[in-house]
Amino acid sequence: MAGSLVESEALQMGVRRLSSPLTSPVQAEVYFPRLTVPFCGHIKGGLRPGKKILIMGIVNLEPKNFDIRLTCGDSEDPAADIAIELRAEFSDKQFLRNARVSGKWGEEESSIAYFPFIADQPFRVEIHCEHPRFRIFVDGHQLFDFYHRVESLSAINTIKINGDLQLTKLG
């Protein structure tokens, strides 16, 4: 689990670690009592190649959309850079991605092999930070890559989640 958001947030959120003299430390079941939507959380130390972010949740019964943003802080004025915005649009079954740098949105990417989300069903999104790109997995299947548009990965230190979903776990 080295490099995961859970590990980096464990101390900040007061998560206990279990250990015994015969085994290495084990991450306790993580419970975030404040996983309400909209959600805004800090990524300790920012991102770097090798770091992963896990988002688990359940899509609402009649969803329109939801989005996951990794941002460079949570400033509204001036607006923080958005390193990646993942937006699930249920009406046209699109999983869109884009970035906003210095106040300007880039070109939106939309091609996917299939739409992975189903109303009233659980999902698991993993965002793997690699040197040139983010690699996005949904329910264990790689769905697409998104090449970095923000130069300083360590500046990407905030996760924001909003829309028609319930969060069950972040890691």
UniProtKB/Swiss-Prot annotation:
It comes from the Eukaryota. InterPro entries: ConA-like_dom_sf (IPR013320), Galectin-like (IPR044156), Galectin_CRD (IPR001079). Pfam families: Gal-bind_lectin. SUPFAM superfamilies: Concanavalin A-like lectins/glucanases. CDD domains: GLECT. The gene is lgalsl-b. Residues 38-170 form the Galectin domain. PANTHER family: GALECTIN, GALECTIN-RELATED PROTEIN. One of its GO terms (molecular function) is carbohydrate binding. The keyword Aminoacyl-tRNA synthetase does not apply. The lineage of its organism: Eukaryota, Metazoa, Chordata, Craniata, Vertebrata. Does not bind lactose, and may not bind carbohydrates. It comes from Xenopus laevis. SMART domains: Gal-bind_lectin, GLECT. This is Galectin-related protein B. Keywords: Lectin.
